[in-house]
Curated annotation (Swiss-Prot):
GO biological process: one example: cellulose catabolic process
Organism, scientific name: Cellvibrio japonicus (strain Ueda107)
Protein name as annotated: Endoglucanase B
Domain CBM2: from-to ranges: 30-130
Annotated localization: Periplasm
Signal peptide residue numbers: 1-29
Length: 511
């Protein structure tokens, strides 16, 4: 299958807003973008993003579109879809309201018609916002285009959902008092029954109120009529203090950065995933430069150890990977994390990863397509004999133990619960569901395993990292990427304790 990875075509759309939900006289200024995120010989994926640049909250939205070349949608996620060309999309409950400055996004996958990934006109009520029509920073194999819909028309205000678990009754049960969680810039449902960490209720992932409230400003619990956090009390924060070791300085720094410049050129690589619970290579003083502190290890109960010479749990010692090395979202398009790389002087180096929209070894992977245009910055904490050049083995709880396994003993789980040795939960889900299932099915399966292994045992931080993989990382299976070495953000060095900036030795060449 010949993949055209990373091809993105933006289109400014007319955005249909449900008139009954709008207050009289309010002026909406939403920017709506249709993007072809990936295309291969017979199919495509695309996303539609609605950004509220207006002066009031958008309460309810609807968009419609029609393919004229025979293209057809085969699956969707994060929206209720109806019709068989034309198509209409409406919210799934938790993304009904769009606070000022926030956005919602949903995606579709389909089969191509007689042309390459047609960009249809999307109709609805007028979107009044102005947005950039510049191409995405993803390397493009085709020219980008931008079209403003000049003749929008009203779309149906009542669209039934064709996505399991997205009916109005089930959606409303995940929402708590017309509130949602602004999880580092992404609106996420609040849980009704889960008291701490992340949960999975009524067919979707949700965040407990205490966990949501523990985020730094401006994030937290928001009203559907306001983007201002409603709860950040010290009592709420203290109840989940154990689930986050991020310092206040780190939190404030993380909230001030939402994007990084795109990579110009760069090196070719790909990302895999693992979490083996072992003490990492960079945890020994002999493996880091003399002016750099080694990575601290933790005990079996996740308490930091001051003795850097403690042996690895994978060799019978008491040193484990600390749970604060989970990946985390900074914005909807930027995340930070930690990774194993190939051998050499890598400890403490940071790399910008820009995902191209295709998989390294799984052609047509819907998760890799949905990940297109997103960026990660990872710090190297480990090396692996099974990690090749250009490969970044990202630390993801539930990502597979790989060559070593100290997790079964540390977490009290069976080997079978850990999923596939290489690939973890997602690989096990693909074995269970087959390799032609929809992205929403893969995500749901992974989230169920996150809840079963971590949520049921109160392993909140690990559950957050696992959920991040399904949500922000789009359950992408070994996505291809462009990368380059960059200065390390304070958010990463504060957590790891490794800061090699004094060495001023960033490499600008590909291996």
């Amino acid at each position: 299958m010949n993949l055209l990875s990373g091809w993105v075509r933006p289109l400014m759309l007319g955005c249909g807003l449900l008139g009954a939900a709008l207050s009289a006289g309010s002026i909406q200024a939403a920017v709506c973008e249709y993007r072809v995120t990936n295309e291969w010989g017979s199919g495509f994926t695309a996303s539609i993003r609605i950004t509220n640049n207006g002066s009031s909250t958008i309460n309810g939205w609807s968009v419609s579109w029609n393919y004229t070349d025979g293209s057809r949608v085969t699956s969707s996620w994060n929206a209720g879809l109806s019709g068989a060309n034309p198509y209409s999309a409406t919210p799934v409950g938790w993304n009904t309201s769009i606070p000022i400055g926030s956005s919602v996004e949903f995606g579709v996958q389909g089969n191509n018609g007689s042309s390459r990934a047609q960009v249809p006109a999307v109709t609805g009520a007028i979107c009044g916002g102005q947005g950039s029509s510049a191409p995405s920073s993803v390397a493009s194999s085709s020219s980008s285009s931008s079209v403003v819909s000049s003749t929008p028309r009203s779309s149906s205000s009542s669209v039934s959902s064709s996505v399991p678990g997205t009916s109005s009754s089930s959606s409303s049960s995940v929402l708590t008092g017309a509130q949602a969680c602004n999880w580092y810039g992404t609106l996420t449902p609040l849980c009704n029954n889960t008291s701490n960490g992340w949960g999975y209720e009524d067919g979707r992932s949700c965040v407990a109120r205490t966990t949501c409230s523990a985020q730094p400003a401006p994030y937290g619990i928001v009203s559907t009529s306001s983007s201002t956090p409603l709860s950040s009390s010290s009592s709420s924060r203290s109840s989940v203090a154990s689930s986050s070791s991020l310092s206040s300085a780190t939190s404030s720094s993380a909230s001030s950065v939402s994007s990084v410049p795109p990579i110009d050129g760069g090196c070719n690589g790909y990302a895999t995933r693992y979490w083996d619970c072992c003490k990492p290579h960079c945890g020994w003083s002999a493996n880091v430069p003399s002016l750099v502190s080694p990575l601290q290890s933790c005990s079996a109960n996740n308490t930091r150890l001051s003795d850097v010479s403690v042996g690895s749990s994978c060799d019978g010692g008491g040193g484990y990977m600390c749970w604060d090395k989970i990946p985390f979202a900074v914005s909807p398009t930027l995340a930070y994390g930690y990774a194993a790389t190939s051998s050499g002087d890598v400890c403490g180096r940071c790399y910008q990863l820009q995902f191209t929209g295709s998989s390294y070894n799984a052609p047509g992977d819907p998760g890799s397509a949905a990940l297109a245009g997103k960026t990660m910055i990872v710090q190297a904490t480990n090396i692996g004999y099974d990690v090749s050049g250009g490969q970044f083995d990202i630390l993801v709880p539930g990502g597979g133990v790989g060559a070593f396994n100290a997790c079964s003993a540390q977490w009290g789980v069976s080997n079978a619960e850990l999923g596939a040795q290489y690939g973890g939960f997602l690989a096990a889900c693909k074995q269970q569901l087959g390799y032609n299932a929809s992205l929403s099915q893969y995500k749901s399966c992974v989230l169920n395993r996150c809840d079963s292994v971590f949520g049921s045992r109160g392993l909140t931080q690990l559950q957050q990292g696992c959920t991040w993989f399904a949500e922000w990382f789009e359950a992408a299976d070994n996505p291809s990427l462009k990368y380059k070495e960059v200065p390390c953000p304070a958010e990463l060095t504060t957590r790891s304790g490794m800061n090699r900036s004094i060495l001023n030795d960033i490499r600008n060449t590909c291996p």
